[in-house]
Amino acid sequence: MTNSENFIGAMSSMYNTLAANRAYLDSLNVFPVPDSDTGTNLCRTVKGGADAVRRMEQLGVTDLLEKSAKAMLRSARGNSGVIISALFKGFSDHMSRLGAFTPSELSAAFDSALKSACRVIGRPIFKGTVLSIVIACRNELSKSKFSTTKEAFSILAPAAEEALRQTRFDLEETRNAGVVDSGAAGLTLMIGAVDSFLSRKGEPKSLQKGEQILFKKHAPLPASEYTYCTEFIVLRKNKMSEEELEKRLSGVGGSVIVVGDGEIIKVHLHTNDPGKAMELSSPFGALTDIKIDNMALQAEQNRR
């Protein structure tokens, strides 16, 4: 298979693996709020990236990366989905600057992904979250010897799993519930899916009962202080920065994530006043793809 075919296949494998584990990832979701939608949101996010590059074998890997990253920004859903899209954007930006997808640059690409996510998260938490998986992957690659992407992901998969185990103890929410972080679990599954695909290990991995030392169903936790998970896309009409928009929105909610490219800005936040959040964002451009979920209602449904 060509490098481009491998990339397209790896994207599909990531989506298939998430889809196979969607319900279980949903059940792990306790941070930042227990709204049980991490698996669902990651599936929608990654499906956008996989669909965008399907049957695009004529493109080079860096072009495919850029295309999938842009699509994932548009399809991103939820806190975890928007963060994953920011990680992909940072990864893609690094490889695009090089002009080629180079295995020796994978550690630096993970570092670029980490920086991209940190720029768009108002208050990044490095321990016990998806970011801890990125850090572990970056660090492991920086001290390992490999010459191919296949070899790199055979190193990354166990490193991510080891880092995932630790997330059970790093956050109060996951400690109390006895689970690993759902977003971190999602990224770990994605990395494992790429490893399985490149190594031709067979079908995407599903979480089985024997693995519940890592993944244990929890009792739902108290709901967030904010009622609404609010998301929308801003169609840029000027050069106002994402940083300025993030600053405005941080006054009306929490879990604020603002990430953009040259055409759009994707906004995610938890708030009690979605209308105010949209009002503050409207000077940056027209709003589209508006989505508002009542997290208090979701949390109550999870208690039943």
Language model segments and positions:
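N-terminal loops that bind phosphate or other acidic moieties
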Residues: 1-304
